[in-house]
Amino acid sequence: MDRWQGIQHVVVVGLGITGLSVVNYLRKYHPSVTVQVIDTREAPPGQEQLSSDVALHRSGWNLEWLLNADLVVTNPGIALATPEIQQVLAAGIPVVGDIELFAWHVDTPVIAITGSNGKSTVTDLSGVLANAAGVKAAVGGNIGVPALDLISPDVELYVLELSSFQLETTSSLKLKAAAFLNLSEDHMDRYQGMEDYRQAKLRIFDHAETAVVNADDTQTFPDHAAHLQVVTFGVEQAAQFSLAQHQGREYLFARDEAVMACAELSLVGRHNVANVLTVLALLDSAGVNFRLALDALKSYTGLTHRCQVVADNHGIKWVNDSKATNVASTLAALSGLKIEGQLYLLVGGVGKGADFTPLAPVLATLPVQLCCFGVDGHQFMPLHPSARFYDSMESIIRSIRPQLKSGDMVLLSPACASFDQFKNFMARGDIFAQLARQYA
């Protein structure tokens, strides 16, 4: 069936790197289609890269364009509940995202990953190990390169990170294997509650052959699994991909096979052991022989902005975990820590309506000074008696620098989004790393 039959006029809502990837894809593969772009921002990012023959409407909506479209492609950041998008849907005009266009185009095997935390590490490591095993993999989606920019005839496996926002507008993505890593409170400003958020994530299994789920978090299990093969991973509960003692050491196990000692991993933290087990389960389900890539697994140190040591001088560790944009990410970082001295924990930013109280019992067990900043930083103040509020990240570091001593750790794991004071979490992490090197 030709999905494009009768589609002559496409409106792309939201520019940026995803919107640009949609425009470039349409111009390359569907040159006869007329493309218009709507972006409600005054200066949409990427507008200077837009071809002069693509009409752009800025600083607001253009309902005339929307209601005359044959297809509307929205940016994942735009909720389907937005009144203008609701009008489009009410008019019977299909609304999709870039991942749905990708799904219409490719017939090469695809694996995909969703979850509240750990998605980027699992996605990146899956690509690294697939390539090391001799399978040409292309990695992207919600991480790095937009999915449509990955399309190439020589790719043998696509590895996509998918957010709940992307899954909302995706309905026909066929997957060799799909992983749902975990579920914790996030984006409560967008969803009606946790079950609403969970249902968006579960869409990843709609057309998957294998569901890779977390035995330690049953909320990741599909509600309807008749069409699926279900494979489990876990570090606490019994699972097909799990941990067990072998020759006196803790080993990663794939089904009943001892794969590698945990001590041989370069990755730090218990949450990363779970991430590795997920990758093994995904690749195995997709027919990739991960055993050919164990050297690459041993040497893999993880992604920037995710529990990354950016400076280690005079015995003081500076750790950039800027990607921790919700409470569960920060809890994961704290659970994997080994600290000899004092922990200086930097938290705050845009809270997205989250409840931060689950941090309190964990903080109570740690030698911590809580350093709060950002628009919702004050919400962390009741969590620990050491809490102090600062007007910026730099003022925190200037203030604590004279008291730092060997064995201490300065950890940026904010449990919040960054866009109150920074362009994005990467910019926040880069500035932290720069300050760490300056003051270390």
Curated annotation (Swiss-Prot):
It comes from Vibrio cholerae serotype O1 (strain ATCC 39315 / El Tor Inaba N16961). Keywords: ATP-binding, Cell cycle, Cell division, Cell shape, Cell wall biogenesis/degradation, Cytoplasm, Ligase, Nucleotide-binding, Peptidoglycan synthesis. Pathway: Cell wall biogenesis; peptidoglycan biosynthesis. It is an enzyme of class 6 (ligase). ATP binds at G115, S116, N117, G118, K119, S120, T121. This is UDP-N-acetylmuramoylalanine--D-glutamate ligase. InterPro entries: Mur-like_cat_sf (IPR036565), Mur_ligase_C (IPR004101), Mur_ligase_C_dom_sf (IPR036615), Mur_ligase_cen (IPR013221), MurD (IPR005762). SUPFAM superfamilies: MurCD N-terminal domain, MurD-like peptide ligases, catalytic domain, MurD-like peptide ligases, peptide-binding domain. GO terms for molecular function: ATP binding; UDP-N-acetylmuramoylalanine-D-glutamate ligase activity. One of its GO terms (cellular component) is cytoplasm. Pfam families: Mur_ligase_C, Mur_ligase_M, MurD-like_N. Belongs to the MurCDEF family. Its main location: cytoplasm. It is found in: Cytoplasm. One of its GO terms (biological process) is peptidoglycan biosynthetic process. Cell wall formation. Catalyzes the addition of glutamate to the nucleotide precursor UDP-N-acetylmuramoyl-L-alanine (UMA). Gene3D superfamilies: Mur ligase, C-terminal domain (3.90.190.20), Mur-like, catalytic domain (3.40.1190.10), NAD(P)-binding Rossmann-like Domain (3.40.50.720). HAMAP family: MurD (MF_00639). It catalyses: UDP-N-acetyl-alpha-D-muramoyl-L-alanine + D-glutamate + ATP = UDP-N-acetyl-alpha-D-muramoyl-L-alanyl-D-glutamate + ADP + phosphate + H(+). Its EC number is 6.3.2.9. Transmembrane segments: none annotated.
